[in-house]
Amino acid sequence: MRSNIKSMLICFFDQKGIVHREFVLPGHTVNAAFYVEVLAHLRENMRRKRPDQWRNNTWLLHHDNAPAHAALLTRWFLTDNNMTLVPHPPYSPDLAACNFFLFPKLKMRLKGRRFQTEEIPAELQAVLNTLRENDFQECFKNWQRRWDHCQASEGDYSEGDAGH
């Protein structure tokens, strides 16, 4: 019998690698209050892991338009903490780096294997640990191509387009 236990990973990364990641416990919902806590942890990790970007406030945040991301509480937190947000066009899952880069890599490495729920975070972390700086650099080159394509097509969504 196939199990459809879902494990949620929230992950923030830049061209150098993963800055912050959190696993959401099964049964928990990512609402605005939870997401603001995650963003507070992200800020702390940015301060620790990318001190120059933190000091100069040269880092940007990109996330999709999920309800927790677009909520008023989240927007207040971003404003109050002077966090610069890269806007995400609506209905553009192909522009979310986690969707086209990170999650496919995780799925590819874990596909066909079975885990106990409590094993999932360690297994995901093991896959994350295999990613190298050049993987993240390629991701952002791909992201730029996708943004260029989106802009050239005036935002028309074209799933599976060769430009991706």
Where are these regions (language model features)?
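Surface/interface recognition patches
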Residues: 1-164
